[in-house]
């Protein structure tokens, strides 16, 4: 059973008209979780994308990013919601469909010039990833690529990210679904 078929679809969540793609059914399955990490590991061992550290976006980016960092022998840096990191941070505000939100990273999280693989579970609008990228840059990092389990291309996030000059990789996509 491939990765895509292990992802549950929940209609009208979190609001009417939204088809929510729930990766919890994928990662609770040991074979599914292994497929995700093994496929990403293979890509980054063989693909030639150079990076020094993985940055994961709260919360599901932590699950995938930390397992991938372990598999590749890389470090892991969290990007978190405000007030969750104990040392000095920098923050970035970003737009939501119904307001704004903010994410933070420790100011000493990355070495100057560190090449970063930015990881999250799902790419929809691209808002969170496009907020995390300038955070990484503020603390001296360079985004080598952004990796996701799921891309929802009809929502347009991938186009926005590519337009900003970043590279994108996703394991699967739900186009027109």
From Swiss-Prot:
InterPro entries per the UniProt record, alphabetical: Ade_phspho_trans, PRibTrfase_dom, PRTase-like, UPRTase/APRTase
Subcellular location: Cytoplasm
Family of the protein in this entry: Belongs to the purine/pyrimidine phosphoribosyltransferase family.
Gene3D superfamilies: 3.40.50.2020
Source species: Chlorobium luteolum (strain DSM 273 / BCRC 81028 / 2530)
Alphabetical GO biological process terms: adenine salvage; AMP salvage; purine ribonucleoside salvage
PANTHER family: ADENINE PHOSPHORIBOSYLTRANSFERASE
An example Gene Ontology CC term for this record: cytoplasm
EC number: 2.4.2.7
Keyword Ribonucleoprotein (UniProt): no
Pathway in which the depicted protein is active: Purine metabolism; AMP biosynthesis via salvage pathway; AMP from adenine: step 1/1
Function: Catalyzes a salvage reaction resulting in the formation of AMP, that is energically less costly than de novo synthesis.
Pfam families in the record: Pribosyltran
Protein name in the entry: Adenine phosphoribosyltransferase
Origin: domain of life: Bacteria
Catalyzed reactions: AMP + diphosphate = 5-phospho-alpha-D-ribose 1-diphosphate + adenine
Single annotated GO MF: adenine binding
PROSITE patterns: PUR_PYR_PR_TRANSFER
Assembly mode: Homodimer.
